[in-house]
Amino acid sequence: MNAHSIMRLDPHVAEDKLYFENKVDGVIAGLCHTDACSAEVQKTSYDEFVHILEGSLSIVLNNGHKENFSAGQTFVIPKGLICGREQSVNTKFYYMRFEDETSQPHDNVQDLGVIRLNPSDTITEITIPDTSQFQGLIPKHYKHSYYTDTTGRFLVAMWNSDPFEREVAPFNRYELMIFLKGSVTLSDNHNISEDFNAHEAAFVPYKAPYKWKSEEYLSKYYCIIMPK
């Protein structure tokens, strides 16, 4: 798999798979299979985005509270959160981690807890700073922000958009996309062209040639890591 191009994530992979890693920017993205297990309560050393494909698990906070997640659900564990994990069934999930030794946890990380994403959460229209990228009509974009780390480099949100087409350009970030509604074609305008629909996932690395074309309203979760 080309580490510098648009990637389709395959939910049917039968074993753990590392899709992408860049240690300089602290980026790790992959698919993980775990058997029934438990992990002791301890302080997390990185920010992590998780989307469950099969099975279920519980995140246990240091006060004993449990947050339960099952297939199709998505959450964020912020760096510094004191928590453990319990699961009674085999579980498969996509993940994206931000491992930056210089970043500090939020002071209120225990109040933040495990952050649950919900496709029915309220979205707000956002300003598009540069509309020159669009070919044809300028769309409206909407967002619900869930989490940003203390460096401002790790960002998780739900993002919705009207149909639009943008010209090919080098991608300015690392992004894992979980599509919730609608469809889109992502391409490099040369060798790669991939159609994505609801419940599918893509990863786009920094500097990859990237073109977007959608013909219907679309909603996705994103986990972004900005390069240094």
Where are these regions (language model features)?
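Short, conserved beta-strand element in jelly-roll/cupin
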Residues: 43-59, 170-186
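Conserved hydrophobic/aromatic beta-strand scaffold that supports enzyme active sites
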Residues: 29-31, 49, 74-76, 156-158, ...
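Conserved short histidine dyad/triad with adjacent acidic residue
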Residues: 13-18, 25-44, 140-146, 152-172, ...
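Well-ordered beta-strand positions in beta-sheet-rich domains
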Residues: 31, 66-68, 82, 158, ...
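Short hydrophobic/aromatic-rich beta-strand segments that constitute the beta-sheet cores
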Residues: 59, 95, 168, 186-188, ...
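Short acidic-glycine-tyrosine-enriched beta hairpin
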Residues: 63-80, 190-207
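A short, N-terminal "cap"/entry segment at the start of jelly-roll beta-barrel domains
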Residues: 1-30, 101-153
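Ligand-binding loop in jelly-roll beta-barrel domains
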Residues: 79-104, 197-200, 206-228
